A protein has these predicted regions:
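Non-catalytic terminal extensions that flank enzyme cores
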Residues: 1-82, 153, 235-288, 292-304, ...
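N-terminal catalytic cores of NTP/NDP-binding nucleotidyl/phosphoryl-transfer enzymes
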Residues: 46-119, 221-225
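Catalytic-loop motifs flanking and including active-site residues across diverse enzymes
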Residues: 95, 196-199, 230, 283, ...
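Core alpha/beta catalytic barrel or barrel-like domain that forms the active/cofactor pocket
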Residues: 109-117, 121, 154-158, 201-202
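Short, conserved secondary-structure transition motifs
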Residues: 120, 159-165, 253-261
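Short acidic, glycine/proline-rich loop/turn micro-motifs
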Residues: 122-126
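Divalent-metal (Mg2+/Mn2+/Ca2+)-assisted nucleotide/phosphate chemistry catalytic cores
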Residues: 129-247
Length: 383
């Protein structure tokens, strides 16, 4: 990187300290404003989920138009996905929790993509096909355990759903020149051809309901801002294929427990994230050792307060574990004022994390009974 203000954000690499407003301007997206949040609240009702209310989701493409259409009787569906390279960590759940909230509030269908093929092609650690498939099933079960409706939730498990996806994928692939994929993703000559074709596969769920039903059905994709380039390609070809452009809702990257500006990828620096298969003692150790914004001494922190904005424990509260905005404000102000010391803050968040792990384990056992029934295996139209 050329300087301290340099950062890189692509679907395959995130590094540096990200200037999110600068990134949003570079990508040409719109900010999530208080007026837009009020529109979401008006249409969906109920309290906004933490990640939306507290600014983690900060950027969008065409969300107001999609919401206006829904308010006027035009249905839409949700789409999000997971590349199964290992166990999920808690920050992976942000986009799926938001999708579950939209599904519960609005009764819309949810399409999940498990990209076991892409992780096999892109794995730097040499994941085998068996490993990506097995992790895909494990990840899918964790996702469904968040409370998705079995009757309104469908899964594209790429290697097992290829018969359902391929008729549309070949049509999409014909519309995307190699020069576009190379320019958007920076593919080097050594890149395998699987990843070149993957852009077509990742676009399939965004168009599939419209193609399957023969009518225009808009799509909302909550995703990390790093995934925007994939879906810019999808949006560029949508109207030419007779489909609506997918709307996007972008989140910031969640900081890691060790003080990194972004969360580590699965399998990299295991202490940087809380994995859903971590035993309780491991969760305790990771949180107790997490980077904070505290001062050098208790006396200094009581006098000057701490800095929550750089604290990885505060990020846990902000993203998931402060159930109410009142609790989040209490934690934030206690930290800044020096009333709440880091040890007590960690104890409080650990109580909530362990409670979540227990409830998630019970929900996961139930979801395992129906997870495979969500996988789509046949196309609604012939090749």
């Amino acid at each position: 990187m050329a300087g301290n203000d340099e950062f890189v954000v692509t679907p395959y690499e995130v590094k540096g300290r990200i200037d999110y407003e600068r990134l949003r301007e570079q990508f040409g997206t719109q900010p999530v404003t208080p007026e837009l949040l009020a529109k979401v609240h008006h249409i969906a009702g109920g309290d906004l989920p933490p990640a939306l209310a507290r600014g983690i989701y900060y950027s969008h493409r065409d969300l107001p138009a999609l919401l206006d259409g829904f308010a006027n009787g035009k249905p839409f569906f949700l789409y999000s996905g997971r590349g199964p390279s290992g166990p999920l960590h808690t920050s992976h759940l942000l986009q799926f929790s938001l999708c579950q909230w939209f599904q519960k509030r609005l009764g819309v269908p949810m399409y999940i993509q498990i990209t076991d093929d892409e992780k096999f092609w892109s794995s730097k650690s040499g994941l085998s096909r068996d490993e990506t498939v097995q992790w895909g099933l494990e990840n899918l079960t964790d996702i469904l355990a968040l409370g998705f409706d079995p009757k309104r939730t469908f899964t594209f498990f790429d290697s097992r759903s290829i018969a359902a996806m391929y008729p549309l994928a070949v049509r999409i692939a014909r519309k995307i020149p190699y020069s576009t994929v190379k320019a958007v993703f920076g593919f080097e000559p050594s890149m395998n051809i699987g990843l070149v074709f993957y852009t077509a596969l990742q676009t399939v769920p965004a168009f599939w309901p419209s193609w399957a039903e023969g009518r225009s059905i808009p799509c909302l994709i909550p995703c990390g801002i790093d995934q925007d380039p994939h879906f810019r390609v999808s949006r560029d070809i949508a109207e030419g294929m007779g489909f609506p452009k997918p709307a996007l809702l972008h989140s910031q990257m969640v900081p890691g427990l060790l003080g990194d500006s972004v969360m580590s990828t699965t399998g990299d620096r295991a202490d940087n994230a809380l994995f859903l298969n971590d035993p309780p003692e491991t969760v305790d150790r990771k949180v107790r050792n997490a980077f904070t914004g505290g001062r050098a001494t208790v006396e200094e922190q009581r006098r000057l307060g701490a800095n929550p904005e750089i604290c990885s424990v505060w990020a846990l509260w902000r993203t998931q574990f402060a159930e109410t905005n009142a609790k989040f404000s209490e934690i934030t102000e206690g930290c800044r004022s020096g009333r709440l010391l880091c040890g007590e803050c960690k104890s409080q968040v650990l109580e909530r994390i362990h409670r979540f792990y227990r409830s998630h384990a019970a929900a996961r056992a139930q979801a395992a009974e129906w997870a495979e029934s969500t996988i789509l295996t046949s196309a609604p139209r012939p090749l």
